[in-house]
From Swiss-Prot:
A motif (Walker B motif) lies at residues 312-317. It holds the Pfam family DNA_pack_C. It comes from Saimiriine herpesvirus 2 (strain 11) (SaHV-2). GO terms for molecular function: DNA binding; hydrolase activity. InterPro entries: DNA_pack_C (IPR003498), DNA_pack_C_sf (IPR038435), DNA_pack_N (IPR003499), HSV_TRM3 (IPR033663), P-loop_NTPase (IPR027417). GO terms for biological process: chromosome organization. This is Tripartite terminase subunit 3. The keyword Cytoplasm does not apply. The gene is TRM3. Belongs to the herpesviridae TRM3 protein family. It is found in: Host nucleus.
């Protein structure tokens, strides 16, 4: 750190040296250093001399040369717009130090004719590269586009967003690969300095050579805006380039077509522009250059692009493109010198059309997503209504975008979940029913790992003597469909809101006979007997048998359990409104949502746990019962209803929720303390 008293003197000295030191050109006519080493251990470096080959592995040499002789100096003037004056502040060297360094290097110059020849050849190669027509053409495109975006295209805009720069890079570097295949890697390295990519690994640059790139970007971010600018500068700067543009609607294609025409006519001579409105084509021909073309089409006229030759094909709002148009578009993948660039916003209205997100698992990294939510905090974002940014990232918002809590609430009132998808760019959370995950992964991990050892006396003596069992019967032998789910819960004496899952069953009937109720009741009784072995302090069991499927069968199950149970069993009863009779069954209704909400809260807060000695006669033989339950817990989703309420479900094509419902309802009855359980013979 500089001392305050020395700061003024240092500033004065720097000003004096800056004013007296003249800018000198980088002289490559004679070598500065020629090393006295064997030919196999040296290399000719065009900007310095003949140096030991080991220096090529050091970034210091490259950094030094680019600092004092950057490629971006002395650039040609742009054809339109204002040239960006890049700041270039190289360290100033005192004259005495400069003289001393020159003295040292002059003493170490070895007069080697062969080495001089090697150096001159390296210098000539460097000059040839810098005078190559392809390099000059591509450099002119970069300068033109940079200058055009520097307050020319839009007066108040001089900067572009990171995703817009990435779109430019995918376009530009693919141009290099098709314009100069033999010099692709060398030109890749040269243009790294133009885009500020000096530190990027060369292997990473190969991504830009992909045949297809996909960009998923939220609404109103300037997707089409930057495409118009890129295409306009491509036509005017690069000869013999053929560009295609496909939109999902005719008016969008016409709008882009008109905007490009207006841009070209405003900033470039009209005599170079040939417009063919009947087929949406623009031909731009500069003097002494081959013409470049643009064709704008829509997905409704898919045959218009068949038979065409495109080097770059931009597919705008690709998620909304008609599916029968995709074969005509994807056919250009076979063309060796063609690249497809899919650009789209998220289609939250229809998951079936959001096909671009399927490429997230592609072997090539071709999917680029602008998203304000990271995968690790997606759950937090869905659970907290007031959250408008990712908890771990500083939310970068473009100046022309507004994201706040009011916008979020209003947008979601129109379409639930639209804020997350349309505005925040989150694709992975889309579903047909706009479902949201409600249990965090951290809570599930804690539930799985932190299991109580209920065989220890100090734990057992803290448990109540009443066990709660819920039975969700299924009268089918189809193992691919629903089975009978049974859940058993014990609560703590000192805190009835805390409980332990001690048993669960998922029972499937072997065949459809008249003994279905007996088999289900026997399964429940086996669970009760096994519980008494581990927990002999249990004095009674409170049972709820769901009767939604068949009330008669549910009554039969309750009766059989009452007869076969080794201890007292109390049942919840349902009162018949017509006969005032009470049946030992439970009719599941609106309380299901309340039960799920209390269970979700218990999992997230850690007030429910599982026993290490979980009882299961049907699951444990092939699967860990708790892992079996966790698989269903992960599938819990909340469905919003039209009346503003919510319902919960965990059913999936490959996962049923029978065991989960039984455990959830058993927990609900064990902790709610508002239901009456009575003996079967009670009136």
């Amino acid at each position: 750190m500089l001392l305050l008293k020395a700061k003024k003197a240092i500033i004065e000295n720097l000003s004096e040296v800056s004013s007296t030191q003249a800018e000198t050109d980088w002289d490559m006519s004679t070598p500065t250093i020629i090393t006295n080493t064997s030919k196999s251990e040296r290399t000719a470096y065009s900007k310095i001399g003949v140096i030991p080959s080991v220096n090529l592995y050091s970034s210091t040499l490259t950094s030094f040369c680019k600092l004092y002789h950057p490629l971006t100096l002395n650039q040609t003037q742009p054809q339109t717009g204002t040239l960006r004056l890049l700041p270039h502040e190289k360290p100033l060297i005192l004259q005495d130090l400069s003289n001393y360094v020159k003295l040292l290097t002059s003493q170490n110059v070895c007069h080697d004719t062969e080495a001089n020849t090697e150096y001159n050849a390296a210098v000539q190669t460097q000059k040839t590269s810098m005078e190559c027509p392809t390099y000059l053409e591509l450099r002119q495109f970069v300068i033109n586009l940079s200058s055009f975006l520097n307050g020319c295209y839009v007066k108040r805009s001089t900067h572009i967003e990171p995703f817009q720069l990435q779109l430019i890079l995918h376009t530009f570097y693919f141009l290099i690969s098709i314009k100069s295949p033999e010099s692709t890697n060398r030109l890749f390295d040269i243009f790294k300095e133009y885009f500020g990519l000096r530190e990027m690994d060369p292997d990473m640059l190969q991504i830009f050579k992909q045949k297809a790139s996909i960009f998923l970007i939220p609404r109103r971010h300037g997707k089409t805006w930057i495409v118009v600018a890129i295409i306009s500068m491509l036509l005017t700067s690069v000869e013999n380039i053929h560009v295609g543009y496909v939109a999902h609607q005719k008016h969008v294609a016409n709008s882009v077509f008109t905007e490009i025409i207006n841009t070209l006519q405003k900033w470039f001579p009209s005599r170079y522009i040939d417009i063919k409105k009947e087929n949406g084509t623009i031909i731009y021909k500069s003097p002494d250059k081959k013409p470049s073309t643009l064709m704008c089409a829509t997905c409704f006229n898919k045959n218009s692009i068949r038979g065409q030759t495109f080097n770059l094909l931009y597919i705008d709002e690709a998620n909304f493109i008609k599916k029968d148009s995709l074969p005509a578009i994807l056919g250009f993948m076979l063309q060796k010198d063609a690249k497809l660039i899919f650009i789209s916003s998220v289609n939250s209205g229809d998951r079936a059309t959001s096909f671009l997100f399927n490429l997230k698992n592609a072997s090539e990294k071709m999917l680029n997503i602008v998203n304000y939510i990271c995968p690790d905090h997606k759950d937090d974002f869905s659970l907290q209504d007031s959250l408008i940014s990712c908890p771990c990232y500083k939310l970068y918002i473009p100046t022309y975008i507004t994201i706040d809590e009011t916008i979020k609430n209003t947008t979601n009132l129109f379409l639930d979940g639209a804020f997350t998808t349309e505005l925040m760019g989150d694709m992975s959370g889309i579903s047909k029913s706009n479902m949201h995950k409600v249990i965090s992964e951290m809570a599930i991990t804690q539930f799985d790992l932190c299991r109580a050892d209920t065989t220890k006396p100090e734990i057992t003596q803290c448990l109540n003597s009443t066990m709660y069992i819920y039975i969700d019967p299924a009268y089918t032998n189809n193992s691919e469909a629903s089975g009978t789910g049974i859940g058993a819960i014990l609560t703590f004496k000192n805190n009835s809101s805390k409980c332990i899952i001690v048993g669960m069953e998922h029972y499937f009937l072997k065949d459809l006979t008249g003994t279905a109720t007996y088999q289900i009741a026997s399964c429940a009784c086996s669970l009760i007997r096994a519980s008494l072995v581990l927990y002999p302090h249990i004095q009674c069991v409170h049972v709820a048998v769901e009767g939604n499927s068949s009330q008669d069968s549910a009554v039969a199950i309750s009766t059989l359990i009452n007869e076969c149970s080794p201890i007292k069993v109390y049942f919840i009863h349902y009162k018949d409104k017509t006969t005032t009779m009470q049946w030992p069954i439970y009719m599941l209704g609106a309380e299901k949502s309340i039960a799920f909400e209390s269970f979700i809260y218990a999992i997230n807060s850690g007030t429910i746990s599982a026993s290490q000695s979980i009882i299961s006669n049907t699951i444990k033989l092939s699967f860990d019962p708790i892992s079996y339950l966790i698989e269903q817990i992960r599938s819990i989703r909340c469905y919003p209803l039209r009346d503003g309420s919510h319902t919960y479900c965990a059913k999936k094509r490959t996962v049923s929720d029978d065991v989960l419902v039984a455990v959830v309802m058993a927990y609900f009855f064990a902790t709610s303390n508002k239901h009456i359980f009575k003996p079967l013979n009670s009136t």
